[in-house]
Amino acid sequence: MNSTALAVLLVRGKLPQYEPWRIVFSDTGEERPETYAYMRDHFEPWLAKHGKTLEVVRPDETILERWERLKVTGSRLLRGCTVEGKIKPIERHVAANGGGVQLIGVDAGEAHRMPDRVRPLVDLDIDREGCEAIIKAEGLPSPGKSGCWCCPFMRVGEVIRLAKVDPCKFERIARLEDIATETHGPQPNGQPRTQWGDKPASYWRERAGQGDIFYDEGRLSDDSPHCGCYDG
């Protein structure tokens, strides 16, 4: 959402101080299917109409491949997936292209995030609603939430929906939890290692079978902030 609004401002010449600029998408390899569809069907054609192209960078391995190689579940504290899957690929790309200033799509409602980065939306006091208005005025549909389909910060309803509509992906996480527990032992509290909150995949699988509760959007943990790349 925010990055799309920032791109609109750049394309429309509202941020001339950053000319010339390039738009780079850091693809973790595990983005939500809806994100890939939006980029393909809306964002990239819109950029092309304005004579711009989207540059895509990727890590050497997807974040899930990395977890599987290390035999660990995603960490809600270390946030290594953001660093390895998002930040490092972009930093390598920028360095390989002669360096430059990185503009981050953080809005004014998230001013506490990445205070050491250049954040035009924060500087212009544009919040999430403002971003939505900018995108709508441009004639683009809302990109919706972004983030990885396996993100440890997913909301309750999102985890249950994954178990319902894409059981193959869900079971991949279930296997990862089992392997992580077998390899590294249980958590300090004696419970198995988990990807989403303090409940194992079996719990979410059971809830998914109890009926349509897609609209349960509570957070997995009230004291656990979102990661740096999950826009939910």
PLM ranges: what are they?
Residues 1-232:
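Nucleotide-activated chemistry modules centered on ATP-dependent adenylation/adenylyltransferase
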